[in-house]
UniProtKB/Swiss-Prot annotation:
Predominant cellular place of this UniProt entry's protein: nucleus
Annotation: DNA-binding region: 70-97
Post-translational modification: Could be the target of the SNF1/CAT1 - SNF4/CAT3 kinase complex.
Function, as annotated: Activator of the gluconeogenic enzymes FBP1 and PCK1 genes.
Localization (cell): Nucleus
Protein's recorded name: Regulatory protein CAT8
Record lineage: Eukaryota, Fungi, Dikarya, Ascomycota, Saccharomycotina
Length: 1433
């Protein structure tokens, strides 16, 4: 107690006793008493702190004062005498004297106010949601009360109730207006609307009562006020109500929106980035535009954050890596040969199974051995230790163990098979295998075929169940095949083998024939489809989904089982089949809904076609049995439903109905409207809450006042020991968390459309003004570092204050938290956990952009995201199927961390951080650290004998040896002696230059990329023209190239049959080193010299180097076709035309080079073609306006024919922006300017802008690449339309226009002689276009036409032709697409410039044509930086 008092006194105002003062008079004491009664705040504390004295003399009576001044004296900054209970200052004016505890209070943590504001927003959103739900329920009550007949006893009650409803505020809510207007819409549709009943229809009490539920027929359009048990999506009353005529088609708004994007280049670039992200899943379709827009607002479209995010989203579309199929570790060479033979046998069986009909496998014993079943163990009651031959096979005991795991964790998730029914089949199967093992069973050929076919189908079902059990066992016991001499490593090898077999089961000819459709085969395919959903195999889901739905409809599973089966069947068998049919149908329904969610397409099974009733739960079944026993004496007959599932399975089927209804509303025509989606979201919220309230008591979860669950409690339940066995209580808790996960998943899908349909937030005017003033004040001493700060509005109030946005963020955080709580076990969910975690993590990171860096909310989100990354990493180390690849995981980690960083972080720190991440993942994969800090230039090593290398100033290495950036030369040519040099080329950096020269010589001796004269010229010319280090404060580093372009898994490491892990790792190491060493040719290959036929692949020690572009090929490779794949001979004319170039080209390997080129041509062309298409999509601003979509998708392979110079000039002057239709023949290539015929991808000279632009324009597109198509009808078109200032948009965008309209893409710009000499940073507004940045780097010119001739491999005749055509091109402006590699130039005078004051130049560029030594190369031929679109801030 003493300690408590002392602590309390320490926190109270300190009392000072003053001696020698006069005694207090009587009236003063009375005043103090009255004052203390009026102000008792500190009276008690002061009494406890005061020291009483008994001195009788007045002079010795002490006066007590407080050491701290009162609040009024502190605010007025006057001296306080500290008298108690009222100081003199307060007593003089009659104010209450108060002393607060401000000096002793600790400061609130950072972000405390923000957390309070966020909580207020959450409470307001939840209050708004609950009020809307109450409105819906009260409205339903009122509508139901109108439909029933009223009696005389409750007329007065109903009258008062109606009167109260009229006066209630719920009549004014938008929800009720939406519900009640459906009746008006129905009357308008039927043409029965008139002025008399229009007013009453709007009233909730004047609306006509709806028909009873049993007599109600839904039309899907005007009866949304009913919460249907069967959601509707089409019209039943009037099939002609929906029109698809040209003037009424629902796609017209999307077409108009896309057309209006011609004047809104910012929207065009957003659409391009969205298309590059290839949105496929439903979540990505809805949130990608908002995510990329927010990143643009904070970081910019050309930032590392945007680049890595788009790369991450694109990598999600690749097929997830399969587990390695490895052989068991052996000690002797003899055993190694045996194991190699076993691997060959396994591969042969896989190929045979895929091509041979299942009915042709007549030998059941060999078939089971090929499935790794130890049939000898089936006949032994007590198993003996397995020998070497049976060591890799599954014994009967192990099979039973894995089946137990399946029924414990998977069976309730996918209620396809009943446990009791399966045991009957399994015991029968075991008996058959026992006879096979002892070879006592002999059957004739007539019955063997049918019997073994059924047993083989059951064996395949058993294989799928064992694979699911293996996944649980490996995750639970953390089994790794890399651990030496691990006795359980065989489970990992079996998992890889079963995964390979499971992918080809639907491809067997037996299942492709619809005449063999049966319940067992459909059960097998349904199990396989659920497995594909879990591992995220998109192509397999597409292949099986439609087939199982067609088979289910063929077997009439959607009808009532009692009506389909024959009445003459055996009653026992009839009940048995009814149960199987009912369970199988609803399992297919469940799979179809989640397949629709993953694929981003409408579901196939429509609710209005279904007659099959839901199965009953085991609890209801027990109650039903007890009721039958009670009524047995009365002989009461009641129709009983067959089909029993667990209570959890019934709840997830009911949830699938709700989720299917949500998906129907997303994909329904006309639903992507902000008002409609907000109102429909409340209807779905009501249905979801009803589902939650109807959960059984053991699965029920409570929602807190702010609309979420207690996440701390969920985290606390995750602290159990995973080594202990799961009892029934743990299983119930695990299933409860899964239901929680489904609940928040549905919540996010409800509110994602609401956020997606909101207009994209626009740039703030004051932000652009601040940026403009920043540029104008640069002459006062601003440095490059000052331009790195992006002063943008960090908040978007229109979205952040939205209740749907708040609910979405709550659901996202809750989803990630629940995933972490149950991720210790393998999650048997009908969705790919890895992809789902990445998508929701991006949503969480997007929400973190709104929080204060370092605040409590920001730190909570950061910890949540970092834990999610660690969870995926742990699963990747186990090499489980369906886990994101190392490349995707690396991009995910980098993207999240980049988004969590402040926008003003220096690029050196970002690159240092990214390099650490890159080396971290290399260590995890067993690879050496990435040598991304190599001193080699971007486009290859420089030869010490190069003439150009001796003439120009060498590049300089930065002070930090760990981060080398790619700097170009500081002057363009020798004639530009008066040009200003960069500060980095002064004499103080002489030592660094010497060090760089030595390193360059060493790299050249070590076997650089190129040593031939043509390669030298190409590198010197391209490096000189692509130099951007003197123009931008940021650089695109080798770290970015290595992280984005290098495939870390190595060549064919995931699908190889080689069992030696070391060989695979060595191949990965060699490939990675090769990629890092030859970064320039990873994606520059299509743009090299014409004679370089093996441009797509470099060979090191005769090993092919695997090259991965920034966006890999889509998983559906059959949709991505290249005409050049079947035409390897078309490169021969190119080699003949340039024999000298081919002779000097170092990339033509001797000996086997020709065969290697032909063998690898298809892959290389596809890789280059993919990159080319990517670059064109990203940098072409006319992709949705001036270019025909059909020609864009169906452009044929058209080779340009050689023609005379006159024809070539005509082709140049008449070149247009649009593609020519395929029927018009071959397009005239601008590559014919140089007088050479070039074919396919070789029809461009990289050193000629016209040729390169023609190459980018005339890419051969055969077939449709559906992955790059943007579905504008799903709400993307409303997002892409930037409505304000359409009339004020100027096509010749100036700085003032960009500041006013926030336009990011500039289609054209003036580049006359005076403006071309301006410093580039004036153009580089942080919100400027990628094209504008590309213009900056295209200012520099070539030295001589001879260099151009050497680099392109053309003779002097071609140069003269090029000069002549260049003059013609100057006089006649080309109407070609504006890309990074060719910029439009106008002839407007200097008076047209509105760019403000000129900035001090960092470098001068030789833009005067009179200073060109050759005089033949025009400014239109300048090459910009190929990677400038990826230039980070």
């Amino acid at each position: 107690m003493a300690n408590n008092n002392s602590d309390r006194q320490g926190l109270e105002p300190r009392v000072i006793r003053t001696l020698g003062s006069q005694a207090l008079s009587g009236p003063s004491i009375s005043n103090r008493t009255s004052s203390s009664e009026a102000n008792p705040h500190f009276s008690k504390n002061v009494k406890e702190a005061m020291i009483k004295t008994a001195s009788p003399t007045p002079l010795s009576t002490p006066i007590y004062r407080i050491a701290q001044a009162c609040d009024r004296c502190r605010s007025k900054k006057t001296r306080c005498d500290g008298k108690r209970p009222q100081c003199s200052q307060c007593a003089a004016v009659g104010f209450e004297c108060r002393i607060s505890d401000k000096l002793l209070r600790k400061a609130y943590p950072k972000g405390y106010t923000e957390s309070l504001e966020e909580r207020v927003r959450e409470l307001e959103a939840e209050n708004k949601r609950l009020l809307a739900l109450c409105d819906i329920k009260e409205q339903q009550i009122s509508l139901v009360s109108q439909s029933r007949p009223q009696t005389s006893t409750d007329n007065t009650i109903n009258g008062n109730f109606k009167h109260d409803l009229k006066d209630a505020p719920l009549n004014l809510s938008s929800t009720n207006i939406y519900l009640l207007n459906q009746t008006v819409n129905k009357q308008l549709q039927n043409g029965k609307m008139d002025g008399d009943n229009s007013g009453s229809a709007m009233s909730p009490l004047g609306a006509p009562p709806p028909p009873p539920h049993k007599d109600h027929l839904c039309d899907g359009v005007s009866c949304t006020n009913h919460l249907h048990v069967k959601p509707t999506s089409t019209s039943l009353n009037d099939p002609t109500a929906i029109s698809f005529e040209q003037d009424e088609a629902p796609g017209l708004p999307a077409v108009k929106a896309l057309k209006s994007m011609t004047t809104h280049q910012r929207s065009t670039q957003l659409a391009t980035l969205v298309s590059l992200s290839i949105p496929r899943s439903t979540e990505e379709i809805l949130f990608i535009p908002q995510l990329l827009t927010r990143i643009r607002q904070i970081f910019g479209f050309n930032s590392k954050q945007c680049l890595y995010t788009v790369s991450l989203l694109s990598s999600l579309k690749n097929r997830l890596p399969a587990p390695r199929l490895l052989a068991p570790s052996t000690s002797t060479k003899l055993k190694e040969k045996d194991e190699d033979k076993k691997l060959d046998d396994d591969s042969a069986f896989v190929k045979r199974f895929q091509s041979t009909n299942l009915s042709e496998f007549v030998d059941l014993k060999k078939f089971l051995i090929s499935l790794k079943f130890n049939i000898n163990s089936f006949s032994k009651q007590s198993e003996k230790p397995a020998n070497d031959q049976d060591d890799e096979l599954l014994s009967l005991t192990e099979i039973k163990e894995l089946l137990h795991l399946f029924f414990k964790f998977w069976s309730n998730q996918v209620p396809i098979l009943n446990n009791d029914h399966f045991l009957i089949y399994f015991n029968n199967f075991v008996e058959v295998v026992k006879h096979l093992s002892t070879e006592n069973l002999e059957t004739n050929n007539t019955t063997k075929s049918t019997v073994t076919t059924n047993h083989e189908i059951f064996a395949l079902k058993l294989l799928m169940m064992l694979q699911m059990g293996l996944l649980v066992k490996i995750k639970m016991e953390k089994i790794k095949y890399t651990v030496p001499k691990n006795p359980k490593a065989k489970y990992a090898r079996l998992m890889a083998y079963y995964h390979q077999l499971s992918l080809i089961i639907p491809k067997n000819p037996y299942f492709l024939n619809m005449s063999t459709t049966s319940l067992p085969s459909l059960q097998l395919l349904s199990l396989a489809s659920f497995y594909y959903l879990n591992v995220g195999d998109i192509s397999a889901i597409y292949g099986v989904r439609g087939r199982i739905v067609s088979m289910a409809q063929q077997l009439r599973l959607h009808r009532c089982p009692s009506a389909v089966l024959s009445v003459h069947s055996n009653p026992v068998l009839q009940k048995f089949e009814q149960s199987e049919r009912r369970l199988l149908f609803w399992a297919i329904y469940y799979v179809d809904v989640f397949a629709s969610l993953q694929l981003g397409v409408p579901r196939l099974l429509k609710d209005f076609d279904i007659e099959c009733a839901l199965p009953i739960s085991d609890v209801e079944y027990k109650d039903q049995l007890s009721m039958e026993n009670e009524k047995a004496d009365k002989k009461a007959k009641k129709i009983q439903l067959q089909g029993q599932v667990s209570s959890f399975s019934l709840q997830i089927i009911r949830f699938a109905k709700i989720l299917g209804n949500i998906l129907d509303s997303i994909f329904k025509r006309g639903m992507m409207d902000e008002r409609i989606t907000s109102e429909v979201a409340l209807v779905h919220e009501n249905a979801l809450d009803n589902w939650r309230n109807q959960l059984p008591e053991m699965y029920y979860f409570q929602i807190t006042v702010n609309g979420t669950v207690n996440l701390d409690e969920i985290r606390a339940t995750n602290q159990r020991n995973t080594e202990t066995k799961f009892d029934k209580k743990d299983i119930i808790l695990f299933e409860k968390k899964i239901l929680l996960l489904f609940y928040f998943l549905a919540k996010s899908m409800i509110h994602l459309p609401v956020i997606a349909t909101k207009p994209l937030p626009k740039n703030v005017d004051n932000a652009t003004k601040k940026k403009q003033s920043m540029f104008n004040n640069d002459s006062k001493g601003a440095t490059n570092q000052d331009h790195m700060i992006l002063d943008v509005d960090m908040t978007s109030p229109a979205i952040r204050t939205s209740s749907s946005y708040i609910i979405l963020q709550q659901a996202t955080n809750a989803t990630l938290t629940i995933f972490q709580a149950i991720n210790s076990m393998y999650l048997p969910l009908p969705l790919n956990v890895s992809r789902t975690l990445i998508r929701f993590s991006l949503l969480c990171a997007r929400g973190s952009l709104e929080y204060t860096k370092g605040g409590a909310l920001f730190l909570d989100n950061k910890n949540l995201l970092l834990d999610t990354i660690k969870d995926i990493e742990n699963d990747r180390l186990l090499d489980l199927p369906g886990i994101a690849s190392w490349h995707t995981l690396k991009l995910f980690d980098m993207s999240i961390n980049l988004l969590l960083k402040a926008p003003n972080v220096k690029v050196e720190r970002l690159d240092k951080f990214l390099e650490k991440k890159l080396n971290y993942y290399n260590r995890l994969m067993g690879l050496p650290p990435a040598t991304t800090t190599s001193l080699k230039p971007l486009f290859g090593s420089q030869s010490k004998n190069s003439l150009e290398n001796r003439q120009r100033t060498p590049n300089v290495k930065r002070e930090n040896p760990e981060h080398e950036y790619l700097y170009g030369n500081d002057s363009n040519n020798n004639n530009n002696s008066e040009a200003g040099h960069s500060p980095m080329t002064n004499t103080t950096n002489g030592n660094k230059r010497l060090k760089y020269e030595k390193d360059a010589k060493r790299n050249a001796k070590d076997g650089g990329i190129s040593k031939g004269e043509n390669a030298h010229n190409f590198q010197n010319d391209t490096k000189k023209n692509m130099s951007t280090s003197n123009l931008f404060p940021f650089s695109f580093s080798n770290t970015d190239l290595t992280a984005l372009f290098t495939h870390p898994e190595g060549p064919n490491c995931t699908n190889t049959n080689n069992g030696n892990v070391d060989v695979c790792n060595r191949a990965s190491t060699d490939a990675t080193d090769a990629n890092i060493e030859n970064l320039s040719f990873l994606n520059m290959a299509p743009f090299l010299q014409t004679g370089n036929s093996n441009i797509g692949q470099n060979t090191i020690e005769n090993k092919p180097m695997h090259m991965d572009a920034i966006f890999s090929l889509p998983s559906n490779l059959d949709l991505m076709k290249d005409n050049m794949d079947s035409k390897p001979e078309q490169l021969e004319p190119v080699i003949k035309q340039n024999p000298e170039n081919s002779k000097n080209n170092q990339f033509h390997q001797k000996g086997k080079s020709t065969n290697m080129e032909k063998n690898n041509l298809s892959f290389n062309n596809k890789s280059n073609y993919s990159l080319t298409k990517l670059m064109r999509l990203l940098n072409n601003d006319n992709s949705f306006s001036n270019i025909s979509i059909n020609n864009f998708l169906y452009q044929n392979d058209q080779n340009s024919a050689s023609a005379d110079p006159g024809t070539n000039k005509k082709a140049v002057t008449n070149a247009g922006a649009n593609f020519k239709p395929p029927s018009t023949g071959s397009n005239t290539s601008q590559g014919s300017i140089l007088g050479s015929t070039k074919h396919g991808m070789d029809n461009c000279d990289f050193n000629d802008l016209g040729n390169f632009n023609n190459f980018m324009t005339n890419v051969n597109y055969s077939g449709v690449d559906y992955d790059y198509i943007v579905d504008a009808s799903l709400g993307l078109a409303p997002l892409l339309v930037d409505t304000p200032d359409i009339s004020n948009t100027n096509t010749t965008s100036t700085t003032s226009n960009r500041s006013k309209n926030s336009i990011i893409l500039d289609t054209t710009f003036n580049d006359d002689l005076d403006r071309s000499r301006m410093n580039a940073r004036e153009v580089l507004n942080p919100t400027d276009s990628i094209l504008s940045q590309g213009m900056v780097s295209s200012v520099s010119t070539r030295n001589t036409s001879n260099q151009r001739s050497l680099s392109s491999g053309n003779d002097s005749k071609g140069d003269s032709s090029s000069q002549e055509n260049s003059k013609s091109a100057t006089g006649n402006q080309l109407d070609t697409p504006s890309t990074l590699f060719q910029m439009r130039r106008t002839s407007s005078g200097p008076s047209a410039s509105h760019r403000g004051p000129r900035r001090p130049q960092k470098n001068r560029y030789n833009t005067d044509r009179s200073k060109s030594s050759g005089g033949g190369s025009s400014n239109t031929d300048n090459v910009s930086d190929l990677f400038q679109w990826q230039n980070a801030k």
